[in-house]
From Swiss-Prot:
This is COP9 signalosome complex subunit 4. The modification N-acetylalanine is found at residue 2. It comes from the Eukaryota. It comes from Bos taurus. GO terms for cellular component: COP9 signalosome; synaptic vesicle. The gene is COPS4.
Length: 406
């Protein structure tokens, strides 16, 4: 039967007639090829592709028929469709400028097959082949944005955050031009994930936290975004930005539902965290968040050591390297190195006396400390009032009226 299809195509190529008539006849041959199965179907479809890219066939007809051809292929078995897609791309390559729209469609379908097979890298590379910026065809903003986001997401799945960042940066140039709210959300999610994978944890936390307030996002996904914001904040380097983010999350009542709330509370209240208190939280982390740093410690260990060092700076005026190492559960030399780095980077106030082997912490002013304590007290009182008003709204209304009347 494949031979019959090939013969019909050869006869039609040498015949004359209007574009409409010829297109109709080619369409009949395509339908016949689709009806076949197995190796016969494969050979017949390959013959059809070879005929369509032949320069003797009018470009008007071949474009139209290749578009029809692309609509049929997703209905075929993935193994057959994949082989046909690769064959078609190879045959079209010499005339790719003439078939940009069809090539883009083929690449989108082929990428979907690779994605189903969880072959993330090949799926991404197939989409990269679409000439979104350099081709003659003008693609609309939403199509380009969606494709760049898909490529970035696929590279993330393949644990390649460097390539993912390159394509999310391209998407960044387009996202302000798009009015598609769903695409805007996809962009924010993808960008947050890229920052997370690139270990830019505080920036990722800010993005995730922003997503957790978007009403267009389902409630369960908002809570998931909040969880990621909390995890990234805990993993971030100690400093003012992280302290602000800890305060933001601690004041968000939704965080009380999260498993990591206990760690958040300890960090916000500047309490020392012991290694045995981290096991449960460490199990919640994603694989890339469990990576080790240059000194051999995990990202979580490093973040907690820095947090504990900041907490110690609020408990002591000064401390020896030996005592600091014992407090942080690390060697004295490592404690000195981390303290030195934090002071140098302006993330902790103090200075090091290497002759006596002592870290001196600068004394905080009393007023800002009182301000923080008063702020915390007011926050707790507000929480109590809200809970009372939810439990007894009528009594609350009467009490407020009585207060106003005085």
């Amino acid at each position: 039967m494949a031979a019959a299809v090939r013969q019909d195509l050869a006869q039609l190529m040498n015949s004359s007639g209007s574009h409409k008539d010829l297109a109709g006849k080619y369409r009949q041959i395509l339908e016949k090829a689709i009806q076949l199965s197995g190796a016969e179907q494969l050979e017949a479809l390959k013959a059809f592709v070879e005929s369509m890219v032949n320069e003797n066939v009018s470009l008007v007809i071949s474009r139209q028929l290749l578009t029809d051809f692309c609509t049929h292929l997703p209905n075929l078995p993935d193994s057959t469709a994949k082989e046909i897609y690769h064959f078609t791309l190879e045959k079209i390559q010499p005339r790719v400028i003439s078939f940009e729209e069809q090539v883009a469609s083929i690449r989108q379908h082929l990428a979907s097959i690779y994605e189903k097979e969880e072959d993330w890298r090949n799926a991404a590379q197939v989409l990269v082949g679409i000439p979104l910026e350099t081709g003659q065809k003008q693609y609309n903003v939403d199509y380009k944005l969606e494709t760049y986001l898909k490529i970035a997401r696929l590279y993330l799945e393949d644990d390649d955050p460097v390539q993912a960042e390159a394509y999310i940066n391209r998407a960044s140039l387009l996202q302000n031009e798009s009015t598609n709210e769903q695409l805007q959300i996809h962009y924010k999610v993808c960008y947050a994930r890229v920052l997370d994978y690139r270990r830019k944890f505080i920036e990722a936390a800010q993005r995730y936290n922003e997503l957790s307030y978007k009403t267009i996002v389902h409630e369960s996904e908002r809570l998931e975004a909040l969880k990621h914001a909390l995890h990234c904040t805990i993993l971030a380097s100690a400093g003012q930005q992280r302290s602000r983010m800890l305060a933001t999350l601690f004041k968000d009542e939704r965080c009380q539902q999260l498993a990591a709330y206990g760690i958040l509370e300890k960090m916000y209240l500047d309490r020392i965290i012991r290694g045995n208190q981290l096991q449960e939280f460490a199990a919640m982390l994603m694989p890339h968040q469990k990576a080790t740093t240059a000194d051999g410690s995990s990202i979580l260990d490093r973040a907690v050591i820095e947090h504990n060092l900041l907490s110690a700076s609020k408990l002591y005026n000064n401390i020896t390297f030996e005592e600091l190492g014992a407090l942080l559960e690390i060697p004295a030399a490592k404690a000195e190195k981390i303290a030195s780095q934090m002071i140098t980077e302006g993330r902790m106030n103090g200075f090091i006396d290497q002759i006596d082997g002592i870290v001196h912490f600068e004394t905080r002013e009393a007023l800002p400390t009182w301000d923080k304590q008063i702020q915390s007290l007011c926050f707790q009182v507000n929480n109590l009032l809200e809970k009372i008003s939810q439990t007894a709204p009528e009594w609350t209304a009467q009490a407020m009226e009585a207060q106003m009347a005085q």
